[in-house]
Design a protein with these regions (language model features):
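A short, conserved beta-to-alpha structural element at the edge of catalytic cores
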Residues: 76-89, 106
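Generic C-terminal helix-cap and adjacent flexible tail
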Residues: 135-139
């Protein structure tokens, strides 16, 4: 059923010029597609360029998912979400951002990255988060 729905979504995406990104969630939030590797299997079975994979650093860390799964996703990877420990903004925790950036480079990913976190005080936290991302990103 998941693959059938993804094919339907892919067809709809093709008609509208939209990419469908499968975002795996951690097992506290979902019981289906809980890793980038699983999402890649579904995307491969659907085999449509409109059906891709999203890597969310928070969910990957929650599941202790190896960052090599990002490298393995390669060209199927279409978007990335970042946060830090406790789902707070990047730069406040212990996530291994150098290894994450290296995995993205290994996948050939060079597109946008979204910060998806729990902001406690957006006006004061956004500048340090952006500074951290700019300073830690090797590109």
């Amino acid at each position: 059923e998941i693959e059938e729905f993804r094919r339907f979504a892919g067809d709809q995406g093709r008609e509208r010029g939209v990419t469908i990104a499968i975002e795996p969630l951690n097992t506290k939030e979902s019981n289906i597609l809980t890793s980038v590797a699983e999402a890649c299997v579904v995307a491969a079975r659907v085999d449509m360029p409109e059906v891709t994979v999203l890597a969310d650093f928070y969910h990957m860390d929650e599941e202790d998912e190896p960052l090599t799964n990002i490298v393995d996703a390669g060209g199927r990877l279409s978007h990335v979400h970042v946060a830090d420990t406790g789902r707070l903004h990047p730069g406040t925790g212990s996530y291994d951002y150098p290894a994450f950036w290296q995995a993205l480079a290994g996948a050939g990913y060079d597109s946008r990255i979204s910060v998806e976190c729990n902001w406690r005080d957006f006006p004061t936290e956004v500048a340090p988060a952006m500074r951290f991302l700019r300073e830690s990103f090797p590109g």
